[in-house]
């Protein structure tokens, strides 16, 4: 059984199971996501009017954020954590459930290249509550981001409405997609696009 806080040995073992191709894909994904979000970072503003009044608008990051990552989606961690890194958040946490008692090496490899060292092997609504309120083993955070099941989405909404923790959205549950196609479309590509969403939840 895995502990709530995986050991370095367990994490390294999971990462060693990855092929060079997977690592390269994760590296490239991080580079592309980072390049985009760097351009989005708002700039501080200093202004002095003709009466010598000085105005200063400073962007300041929150202290901590947790990235909730469904068990097999390193892309989710990259997309959630990269903006926080660029914003200057000092404490970034990853919370991801194990799958059949095993760590997902791709998620933990993504965490390693992002420089995230605080990792929790937890999932579901209980993970959201632990991150929002804290436990003897899980330190609370200021904000929780990332998708999950409908139970995760409801838990995020609850901790937000009770003033326990910030969230980025309350409706990031199972995916809802629409494929627009006509007689010229490839039916296999359309079907695979829909089937790909089933990894999120049976009711996606």
What are these regions (language model features)?
Residues 115-203:
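Conserved NAD(P)+-binding/catalytic subdomain of aldehyde/semialdehyde dehydrogenases
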Residues 35, 104-115:
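N-terminal small/polar loop signature for handling phosphorylated ligands or for N-terminal nucleophile
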Residues 2, 45, 53, 57-60, ...:
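Flexible, active-site-adjacent loop/turn segments at secondary-structure boundaries
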Residues 85, 112, 132:
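Short polybasic/polar patches that bind polyanions
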Residues 1-63:
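N-terminal Rossmann-like NAD(P)+-binding subdomain of aldehyde/semialdehyde dehydrogenases
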Residues 47-109:
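Conserved small-residue-rich beta-alpha loop and adjacent elements
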Residues 6, 21-24, 28, 60, ...:
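Conserved active-site and cofactor/substrate-binding residues in soluble primary-metabolism enzymes
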């Amino acid at each position: 059984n895995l502990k709530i806080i995986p050991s370095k040995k367990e994490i390294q073992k999971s990462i060693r199971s990855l092929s060079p191709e997977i690592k390269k894909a994760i590296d490239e994904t991080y580079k592309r996501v980072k390049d985009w979000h760097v351009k989005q970072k708002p700039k501080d503003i200093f202004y002095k009017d003709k009466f010598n009044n000085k105005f200063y608008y400073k962007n300041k990051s929150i202290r901590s954020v947790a990235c909730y990552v469904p068990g097999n989606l390193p892309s989710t961690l990259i997309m959630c954590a990269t903006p926080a890194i660029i914003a200057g958040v000092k404490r970034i946490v990853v919370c991801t459930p194990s799958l059949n008692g095993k760590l997902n090496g791709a998620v933990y490899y993504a965490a390693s290249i992002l420089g995230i060292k605080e990792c929790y092997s937890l999932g579901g609504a209980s993970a959201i509550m632990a991150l929002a309120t804290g436990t003897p083993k899980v330190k609370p955070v200021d904000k929780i981001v990332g998708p999950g099941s409908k139970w995760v989405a409801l838990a995020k909404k609850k901790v937000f409405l009770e003033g326990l923790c910030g969230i980025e959205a309350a409706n990031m549950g199972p995916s809802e997609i629409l494929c627009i196609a006509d007689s010229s479309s490839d039916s296999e590509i359309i079907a695979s696009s829909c089937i790909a969403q089933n990894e999120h939840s049976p009711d996606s």
